[in-house]
Each structure stands twice: as C-alpha cells, then as structure tokens.
Amino acid sequence: MALTNTTITSWKLQEIVAHSSNVSSLVLGKSSGRLLATGGEDCRVNIWAVSKPNCIMSLTGHTSAVGCIQFNSSEERVVAGSLSGSLRLWDLEAAKILRTLMGHKASISSLDFHPMGEYLASGSVDSNIKLWDVRRKGCVFRYKGHTQAVRCLAFSPDGKWLASASDDSTVKLWDLIAGKMITEFTSHTSAVNVVQFHPNEYLLASGSADRTVKLWDLEKFNMIGSSEGETGVVRSVLFNPDGSCLYSGSENTLRVYGWEPDRCFDVVHVGWGKVSDLAISNNQMIAVSYSHTNVSWYVVDLNRVKKSGSVIQGLIQDKPIPAPSSALGTTLRRNYERPTTSCTGQEMKQSSEADRRSPEGERRSPSSEDEKEDKESSAEITNPEDYKEIFQPRSVISRTPPKTTEPFPAPLEHSFSESVLEKPGPVVKIVTPVIDRAGQLKGPITSSTPVQRVEPTVIAAAPRPVAVVTTSASSPSRPVVNTTKPKPSTGIILSTRNEPIGLNAGDFLSHARNAKASAMGDEEALAQIRKGHDTMCVMLSSRSKNLDSVRSVWASGDVKTSLDSAVSMNDLSIVVDVLNIINLKPSLWKLDLCTSILPQIEELLQSRYESYVQTGCMSLKLILKRFWPLISDTLNAPPSVGVDITREERHQKCKACYKQLKNLSNVVKNRAEQVGRHGSTFRELQLLMAPLDY
C-alpha cells in the first residue's frame, strides 16, 4: 500500500538541556511567543529563542534557586524571584540589571508586570502580595488576605485591578487605586494555580488543582461557568486573542471552552506532560514544559482546532453558533477602558499614601548595599549574534523581539500498513524548515531520504557554542549552501560539550565503497577499535595513583604539603582537582598556598580547557579578595625596629606574591578582550587587579 501523509495537529518542536541543575521555573513571552526564560536551581536565568538550540543570554546574581520569572509586555525586561525572597529586574536590550528588590520573607511564587507603568506585583509563599515601584526601588503597597502561598498574579488590561490565585482555594480581586480587596471567589475546592483576564470584557478565568476551569463575571462578581471533564490538574489557561474561546492546559491535554452556555469545543491530546505556560503566535499555540534539567517546546496548530460550533473537513473554519434566545454576556458585557497615557504616579497616589502608613517601612532609597548587590548581578551574553538580532535590531522602529515571524511548519504524520512494515518503504520527500538568525523561517529544503519516523532532537545547552552555522536556501530544489564564514576559533575547549574532542562523527556515516577496496579483516578491525585504548588506560591509571598520593597527604591535615605534592606531579588535572576542593572552602586558603599556586594559576588561565580556566579564575579571585589587603599593607609598612623573623618571612612571601600577581595582570588584561562569559570573568579580575598598577 502507498504511504499516506497527513498534517498533524500538535507536535513536539524541540527539547533542550536548559540548566546544569534542575529547572525550577519558566515563562514564555506572550507578545511574540518566540522568547523563553528559564530559571534553575543553579541560580541562573537563561534566555532562549524558541526553536534555537543555544542560550542567548544568562543572567546571574541570585544566590538561591529561581522560583518564578516574568517578562513585561514588550519583552524588553524580565524579572525573577528567588527562594530567598529577593527580586531582580534586568533590561534585556541593555544587558544589565536594573533593580534588586528585597522585602518578602519567603520564596517568590508569582510575578506580573503592570501593563502601563513602572510597577510590578509579586506574590510569595508567605501569603503576602506586594506592589513595587521600579523607579523608586521600593514597595508601594502590601495586600494581605490570603492564608497560603500566592500561586498566580494577573493585572487587568486597564491596569486598575489585580487578581490573585492561592493555595487556599480562593481567587481575590484587588483595587490598586483604593488599595483594598474588591471581592473573593471561593467556589474552587483545591489550590488555584492560574488566573487570566479576558482581553476585552469583564471576565476572569481560573484553573485549579480540583480539575476545573471557572469563569467569573467581574460586573456582578459571580461565577458564570465551570468546566467538567478535566483529566488532571489545570496548570495554565489562556484566552484566544480575540476573546472568542478559552484554552486550558492540563496533563497531556489541551481543551477549548466556550461559555454562556458552557461547552467544550475540542480536546487535543498533546504529550507535553505537566505543561507550564502557553502563548499564541501566528495562530499556533506554543507550549512549554520541563522535567529535571530538560525543557520541551510543543506546537498546536489552532487552524485545526475546533473553536466554535461548526467544523469543516480539513481546516476548521470558525463560525459563531446561533445565539440563544437570552442575551449573551459576550455582547452586553462591559469592556475595559484603557487609558491613552501610561500609568503615572497620580494613579497610584492613594497607594503611595497607604505605603506611608505601612508599618513595615519598606519604601527606601537606594543604598550602598543595593549597589553592591547590583554589581554582583550580571548578564552574560552567550550568543552575541542572536542577541544583537533579537534585542538590538539595526532598524530603530522595529519591535523587539521581532513580531513578524512565520508559523512553525507541521511535520508529516505517516500511516503504515502491515505490508509496509515487512519491506522498506518508498522514498518520500521531507521538508525541513531553515531558520535564520532572527528566528524566522525561510524557504524549505527538500531532500529525498527513506524515513520511518522523525523525532525532535535533544540538544544540550552550551554556555558558549564553539561555532554557529546558519544555512539558507533560495529555492526548495536547491541544495543547502553554507553562506557564513567560520568564526576564528578561540582555542577554548568547552567543559559542557556533546561530542568528544578530535572525533569526527561524520567518519561513522556510511559512504559509497570503492570497488577496489578490500573488506577489512576481523583482526584488523579489532586492532583499529583498540587503537589508543592502552594509552588511555595507562594515563587514567597514572592519574588515579597521583590522586591517591595527594589524598593520603591531605588526610594528615597538611593542605600546603598536599598542594605542593600535586604541583610536583606536573599534571594540571591533579592541580585543578585539588583547587576545586580548596575553592569550595575558602577558609583553607593561607598565604603559604598563594606562593605555591600562583605560578600554576598562570598556566591554568592560558589553558585550552574551559574547566581549567574557570578554576584558575575562581582561585585568583579568592586570592585577590582575601590576601591583597595583607600584601599591600605589608609591602607599604615602614621597617620595624629590631629583628622580627615572622614579619620578615611574611614580607618575603608577600613580595613573591606581588611579583607573581604582576605577571598575571598582563595575562588577565589580554584575556579581558574576549566576548562572552570568559571575557566578563576576566574583566572582573582586571578590576580586582587594578591596584597593582598604582
């Protein structure tokens, strides 16, 4: 039988390893649907472009796991809350931190930006909600009323109300200007995970762990609809941009709801597991979920999803169902009145007055401690090309991120008969999209290959990719031509890589055999496989013996002798292993260690291996922070009267350290010109070593 190809409704777009430790939170940019922020237990916030394998930017500064993230409406800023209760706000276009906000006593569990002003709201596990003025760097008002963690916050489109969902099974509506609660919805029987305002009308949707989605009338403050039949906890809800229907995301399922009367238009089974966020772009729904260190993107073609009462074979054309005899709320319900100007301080006047009455006194001016925290935060651009394309476009009037994106093409779904499984299938044409640097799709590439099943690729996230190759095709029938020039190699071998060094995977692909070539014999094949194995065994055995020797000295409690032993072995890998342990416990550092290890640090900073460079930078940073004041004071002190052997020994050690640090300053200065994470680290070291030039 012939092979039948049909376009599918939903598919997995991509899966990546987003963090070095477990992912703890993520969010999609709702404006473009093409930007993703992920937070992890590694205390980092990583920024991604949907469908691109490499991280664009990595934001650091938090000292505990990131509990919640949110973009603003223009996707130019991102705020992240940590488990320690602190908030950090970054400007993505300027690649710098704007604010560090402190005040919550427990972890941040929800965030949202005000749609028209420099305000943001945060909810915490401590059950409090706080409204922050980013410009004043302080808390404007605190809303109290929930008894358990606040899981979701949402501002109304006109910016006058704030809705909050909590583990206490309630949804509360707050008046921002009056600074008080308007009403409370209590129909849910379990924790409420998400709330969402209708884009135009006075409606509010909520999704709960009780497996229901409820709709609330914000004029009469009553429930007008409740879903039935959800198979799992409702983790995300989203109104269609035109407000015609409501999407609900639960475990492996997307449902489409209407209201007045209540009805479920469609159910789409998607293998996304526990979906975390939804966004709509180009009539496609982009969904994300995470598990451990992995993040997965999914796409649902909304053209093939039923969003009303009529359906036509193939693509679904939405037509409104006949209106019932009673007037529908969708035609008579009040709409939001959006102000033409941005939210000003006058609108929040009452809230500011309430802040003055607040017993906490959280409104404060920037202090030296805040400035120190801001300096400790950084934005590491790990993919400069994508960063400039998305956040720093050449045209001043273009939006950021770009809004004119093409929809993701759906893969082909193959239907096989039993006879097809018994013999090789016919050759079919697979259409592969080509994605340019802006994340937009170019013309497809057509290739003829026998394909059984196409699965998405799991891509490990590298802090800095070795090379970025962009392919383009002018027509479907033309072969792909690599139009980009290869970047000059930095000579650094990344510590996080997904292929062995010096091994070309293409050598293992099948090639056309030369007719004159003779088949390789069994003995020759085994010899080829074992080539290099004996050398590797000897090297690993030697390294194991060296580590055992260092460990035996370390067990006696003599750190200096064990480090000298590692240095004498003339093996940088042993030195790196010992330094990594000492760096974890800075109290082990002594001035004696500095004189022994500084020459080794110079070698580490010039190494080809990223892990060696990182260890060397960390060790040098600790030495400068802990011992530079002592070295400087000792060398600048006037000569003492009499003989002081201890002081003389200390003076000689400080003099030796100073000489070695001067040599290292030239290495650091040359390395500071690099781009990306290493460049920022060396520039930080250059600042710490600035006193050496005086």
Curated annotation (Swiss-Prot):
<comment type="similarity">
    <text>Belongs to the WD repeat KATNB1 family.</text>
</comment>
<feature type="compositionally biased region" description="Basic and acidic residues">
    <location>
        <begin position="350"/>
        <end position="378"/>
    </location>
</feature>
<feature type="region of interest" description="Disordered">
    <location>
        <begin position="319"/>
        <end position="410"/>
    </location>
</feature>
<dbReference type="GO" id="GO:0005874">
    <property type="term" value="C:microtubule"/>
</dbReference>
<keyword id="KW-0498">Mitosis</keyword>
<dbReference type="Pfam" id="PF13925">
    <property type="entry name" value="Katanin_con80"/>
</dbReference>
<feature type="repeat" description="WD 4">
    <location>
        <begin position="145"/>
        <end position="186"/>
    </location>
</feature>
<dbReference type="InterPro" id="IPR028021">
    <property type="entry name" value="Katanin_C-terminal"/>
</dbReference>
<dbReference type="GO" id="GO:0005737">
    <property type="term" value="C:cytoplasm"/>
</dbReference>
<keyword id="KW-0131">Cell cycle</keyword>
<feature type="repeat" description="WD 5">
    <location>
        <begin position="188"/>
        <end position="226"/>
    </location>
</feature>
<dbReference type="InterPro" id="IPR026962">
    <property type="entry name" value="KTNB1"/>
</dbReference>
<dbReference type="InterPro" id="IPR019775">
    <property type="entry name" value="WD40_repeat_CS"/>
</dbReference>
<comment type="subunit">
    <text>Interacts with katna1. This interaction enhances the microtubule binding and severing activity of katna1 and also targets this activity to the centrosome.</text>
</comment>
<dbReference type="GO" id="GO:0007420">
    <property type="term" value="P:brain development"/>
</dbReference>
<dbReference type="GO" id="GO:0005813">
    <property type="term" value="C:centrosome"/>
</dbReference>
<feature type="repeat" description="WD 2">
    <location>
        <begin position="61"/>
        <end position="100"/>
    </location>
</feature>
<feature type="compositionally biased region" description="Polar residues">
    <location>
        <begin position="482"/>
        <end position="492"/>
    </location>
</feature>
<dbReference type="GO" id="GO:0000922">
    <property type="term" value="C:spindle pole"/>
</dbReference>
<dbReference type="InterPro" id="IPR036322">
    <property type="entry name" value="WD40_repeat_dom_sf"/>
</dbReference>
<dbReference type="GO" id="GO:0005819">
    <property type="term" value="C:spindle"/>
</dbReference>
<keyword id="KW-0963">Cytoplasm</keyword>
<keyword id="KW-0132">Cell division</keyword>
<feature type="region of interest" description="Disordered">
    <location>
        <begin position="470"/>
        <end position="492"/>
    </location>
</feature>
<dbReference type="GO" id="GO:0008017">
    <property type="term" value="F:microtubule binding"/>
</dbReference>
<dbReference type="InterPro" id="IPR015943">
    <property type="entry name" value="WD40/YVTN_repeat-like_dom_sf"/>
</dbReference>
<feature type="compositionally biased region" description="Polar residues">
    <location>
        <begin position="327"/>
        <end position="349"/>
    </location>
</feature>
<dbReference type="InterPro" id="IPR001680">
    <property type="entry name" value="WD40_rpt"/>
</dbReference>
<dbReference type="GO" id="GO:0030901">
    <property type="term" value="P:midbrain development"/>
</dbReference>
<feature type="compositionally biased region" description="Low complexity">
    <location>
        <begin position="470"/>
        <end position="481"/>
    </location>
</feature>
<dbReference type="GO" id="GO:0051013">
    <property type="term" value="P:microtubule severing"/>
</dbReference>
<dbReference type="GO" id="GO:0007019">
    <property type="term" value="P:microtubule depolymerization"/>
</dbReference>
<keyword id="KW-0677">Repeat</keyword>
<feature type="repeat" description="WD 3">
    <location>
        <begin position="103"/>
        <end position="142"/>
    </location>
</feature>
<dbReference type="GO" id="GO:0051301">
    <property type="term" value="P:cell division"/>
</dbReference>
<feature type="repeat" description="WD 1">
    <location>
        <begin position="18"/>
        <end position="58"/>
    </location>
</feature>
<feature type="repeat" description="WD 6">
    <location>
        <begin position="229"/>
        <end position="269"/>
    </location>
</feature>
<keyword id="KW-0206">Cytoskeleton</keyword>
<comment type="function">
    <text>Participates in a complex which severs microtubules in an ATP-dependent manner. May act to target the enzymatic subunit of this complex to sites of action such as the centrosome. Microtubule severing may promote rapid reorganization of cellular microtubule arrays and the release of microtubules from the centrosome following nucleation.</text>
</comment>
<protein>
    <recommendedName>
        <fullName>Katanin p80 WD40 repeat-containing subunit B1</fullName>
    </recommendedName>
</protein>
<dbReference type="InterPro" id="IPR020472">
    <property type="entry name" value="G-protein_beta_WD-40_rep"/>
</dbReference>
<keyword id="KW-0493">Microtubule</keyword>
